[in-house]
């Protein structure tokens, strides 16, 4: 049981393995043939925004992707950068590379799962299961499934997930403001000093 909880929640949390509470998939192992439009193709470098300027054909998507990311699923990096997660928030078709793991769960709130992946205990478990001798380093899909997470009731998951989603939104907003201020400062420095 965590030391900090929202009021009204007293039930015990249950330790479960990720593969007990979620189906886990990885993306295509084939290097795709990119084109100017079609189905957006995601890789490790796209995890923060889940947007990309790489696309594959609709035909390649239909052939390669039987299991597809959908709204409410979670994608996590598993090759190179490991353990960075994001929630799919679009209804558009998305294709994804082998470097990403896809979580589909009926039991977990997606924002709770994302926050859980970032929890120090889970990051430590992911790190322990990572093949550090590989280049780039990676964690196999089966090893991801063995990672334990602590799971409360769905109501508490939803409350926690909403809390962390709001925090992330606030951080993003302030980051944009900070970036804008830095650009303004740069402009002032260029114009005020000759």
Give the predicted meaning of each segment.
Residues 1-11, 176-194:
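Short amphipathic coiled-coil heptad-repeat segments
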Residues 2, 156-170, 174-175:
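Extracellular/lumenal glycan-associated surfaces
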Residues 5-28:
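Non-catalytic DNA-recognition/assembly elements of restriction-modification systems
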Residues 22, 30-60:
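DNA target-recognition patches
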Residues 29, 94-100, 132-155:
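A short glycine-rich beta-alpha junction/loop motif
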Residues 43-44, 54, 61-122:
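A short beta-sheet element
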């Amino acid at each position: 049981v965590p030391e900090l909880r929202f009021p009204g929640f007293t039930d015990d949390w249950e330790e479960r393995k990720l593969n007990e509470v979620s189906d886990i998939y990885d993306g295509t192992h084939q290097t795709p043939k990119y084109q100017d439009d079609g189905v957006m193709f995601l890789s490790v470098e796209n995890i923060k925004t889940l947007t990309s300027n790489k696309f594959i054909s609709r035909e390649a998507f239909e052939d390669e992707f039987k299991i597809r990311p959908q709204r409410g699923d979670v994608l996590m990096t598993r090759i190179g950068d490991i353990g960075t997660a994001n929630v799919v928030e679009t209804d558009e078709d998305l294709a994804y590379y082998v470097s990403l793991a896809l979580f589909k769960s009926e039991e977990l709130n997606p924002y709770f799962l994302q926050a859980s992946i970032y929890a120090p205990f889970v990051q430590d478990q992911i790190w322990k299961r990572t093949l550090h001798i590989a280049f780039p380093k990676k964690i196999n899909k089966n090893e991801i499934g063995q990672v334990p997470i602590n799971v409360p009731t769905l109501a508490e998951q939803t409350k926690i997930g909403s809390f962390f989603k709001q925090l992330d939104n606030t951080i993003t907003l302030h980051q944009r403001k900070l970036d804008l201020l830095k650009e303004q400062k740069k402009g002032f420095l260029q114009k005020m000093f000759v």
